[in-house]
């Protein structure tokens, strides 16, 4: 297939879409308004699971399961080809004092996932630094986290090594070029960039771009703030989650604690209120963090969408335009499956899963 495909947006979805397409089409161009991988893909925690997977629709679950199984080999492949290790780090995850534990266990039995109730004493034995007072725990082995800044760095390096891929950073896309009802390129600040197919993977900004065609994509920015501590490498052996807040151990002893959910438009300014709230959650989960130095505090913008179900597929009435966006809190979680499904659809291959729940048709205003 000798097509030129332009991918608008260089987050993990756009980069992995380009990585997959590069083996199938003639030329791939990735455009990003800033540096690739510096928005929500960089800012998130990197847990390779929805925070509460049993609360999501079957559509999200199908993508999550495929992606979770694929991540280890993706990490190994990128490390081998680029020398940049995305650090897919399997630690397991403890959920503490859930209100819907029965639903979680029923979901696990139905989906055949290794999630089970554990005695709280076993949780404290496994995670001695866990804060006091927790009464109940469930645990899922095999849950990993990925160091997302390193993931996007490795994807960027992999793409730069491919002769048929080009990255255009600081490339402002202002709209789409159309001829006879077909999208034939994008309008940039420097002129027209022609394409046989255009993929919109611009995260929280996707709706703004689609609006230039008179279409309403119900994707909006949802701000999330995180903080980072530096501890001993063996300080926290597993991820822990309680009351909507989590702590994630990296291999080098960094501990991420997050996150907030804020509707603040496109403002990414870290706030003092969020810092204090996140520090309080950190100490409740891990009291030894009391008084510890917060080595970083940042914010990112998630692409909020109804029920977190992404839009994957062609845009009706605008031949040549495709969507792979709207993953909300789970862009990194769902990326491998979303991008493989998208590649299957664009190239006419047999899709890895039923694409119907993600189709833009009938879901745009």
Curated annotation (Swiss-Prot):
Entry annotated with the keyword Oxidoreductase: yes
Catalytic activity: glycine + O2 + H2O = glyoxylate + H2O2 + NH4(+); sarcosine + O2 + H2O = methylamine + glyoxylate + H2O2
Protein name per UniProt: Glycine oxidase
pH dependence: Optimum pH is 8.5.
Annotated function: Catalyzes the oxidation of glycine, leading to glyoxyl imine and hydrogen peroxide as primary products; glyoxyl imine is used for the biosynthesis of the thiazole ring of thiamine. Otherwise, glyoxyl imine is spontaneously hydrolyzed in water to produce glyoxylate and ammonia. Can also use sarcosine (N-methylglycine) as substrate, and, to a lesser extent, N-ethylglycine and D-proline. Has no activity towards other amino-acids D-Asp, D-Glu, D-Gln, D-His, D-Leu, D-Lys, D-ornithine, D-Trp, D-Val, L-Ala, L-Asp, L-Glu, L-His, L-Leu, L-Lys, L-Met and L-Pro.
Binding site for FAD: 12-13, 32-33, 40-41, 45-47, 173, 327-333
Enzyme class: oxidoreductase
Gene: thiO
Pathway(s) of this molecule: Cofactor biosynthesis; thiamine diphosphate biosynthesis
Xref: InterPro entries: FAD-dep_OxRdtase (IPR006076), FAD/NAD-bd_sf (IPR036188), Gly_oxidase_ThiO (IPR012727)
CC terms in the record's Gene Ontology section: cytoplasm
Quaternary structure note: Monomer.
Annotated source species: Pseudomonas putida (strain ATCC 47054 / DSM 6125 / CFBP 8728 / NCIMB 11950 / KT2440)
Required cofactor names: FAD
